[in-house]
């Protein structure tokens, strides 16, 4: 009797060891892709809090330019962030709202004069002031998730220095002579003579303050990092510094200050070339009807370690390409832009060895034996995900939304 019990136990032990070496149940690639496509269908509707796709309406002959501008700015901003994370091997914040956020664009009032106007005679060589009217968003102040200030740096071939460190400040309302007049936000090193580029700054705190206290909205100041004095150790002298002029030029801010009143041709050319590049704010807000879901529907992501920044072996867990065409794969015509996107998915084997130092290895093996359909051993899953910006129509109303965690960028065994 004891011999039979012992034999049965040894057999069970060998079976569980064999099972513990396996990974998730394997799927053929076609089936895996079909499941991924259906998951994306449900994911998009869920993030938009829709139970079914909007009714099909005839596509508009022409999308309003301001709508396209918001869509392009949001898409470009996300691409810039993704490039920076890839270069530095970083991750986004661990807490990211699961549901889609509405995106609003607020342009800075144009400083370019009309054709017959005389350009302003004053010029601030050491800094620039940028102001925005956010009063229209005050009713949604509590829904603000993020605010980005974007300004396009122009190429300045006549710059006296090739590189400058520019700083962004929030202008403060002075209570008295001793109170600060500005608050530092961020800085960037720019190449003054290089091709133009978009610069982005996180100004969430400043805009949040403006939405709650309208009288504190005095705008932003772009200036140089310039210490007021230099200490000379050899003779203990303190030499006052002459302020360095701001050589960086910005679309929508600079352009008329150096022109004469007769240079109307240059003004016209500048206006046309820099069209769509004026400074603006991108505000991302969680709609009120999704605010309640924000607390209970967040997805947490692990921090990306340097160990994960490697090239996966093709046979093992790695990133697999998958392009989703909204019309072909989902049968949807209501998403205007983009027409599709690279969703990708994770697949491949995850080696899993029996280890005596695994605290619950025997428990997990027994669990596998009792429930072979479930997986207690590592599976190939998504690690880094990026958001997707879409432009769609509900009826004849255009809407722009940012959908988080839609693009799989890397995988891991977990």
Curated annotation (Swiss-Prot):
It comes from Bos taurus (Bovine). Residues 1-20 form the signal peptide. Pfam families: TGF_beta, TGFb_propeptide. Disulfide bonds join 309-318, 317-380, 346-411, 350-413. GO terms for molecular function: amyloid-beta binding; cytokine activity; growth factor activity; protein homodimerization activity; signaling receptor binding; transforming growth factor beta receptor binding; type II transforming growth factor beta receptor binding; type III transforming growth factor beta receptor binding. The keyword Cytoplasm does not apply. InterPro entries: Cystine-knot_cytokine (IPR029034), TGF-b_C (IPR001839), TGF-b_propeptide (IPR001111), TGF-beta (IPR016319), TGF-beta-rel (IPR015615), TGFb2 (IPR003940), TGFb_CS (IPR017948). Interacts with the serine proteases, HTRA1 and HTRA3. Interacts with ASPN. Interacts with MFAP5. One of its GO terms (cellular component) is extracellular region. SUPFAM superfamilies: Cystine-knot cytokines (SSF57501). This is Transforming growth factor beta-2 proprotein. One of its GO terms (biological process) is embryonic digestive tract development. Keywords: Cleavage on pair of basic residues, Disulfide bond, Extracellular matrix, Glycoprotein, Growth factor, Mitogen, Secreted, Signal. Glycans are attached at residues 72, 140, 241. The keyword Protein transport does not apply. Belongs to the TGF-beta family.
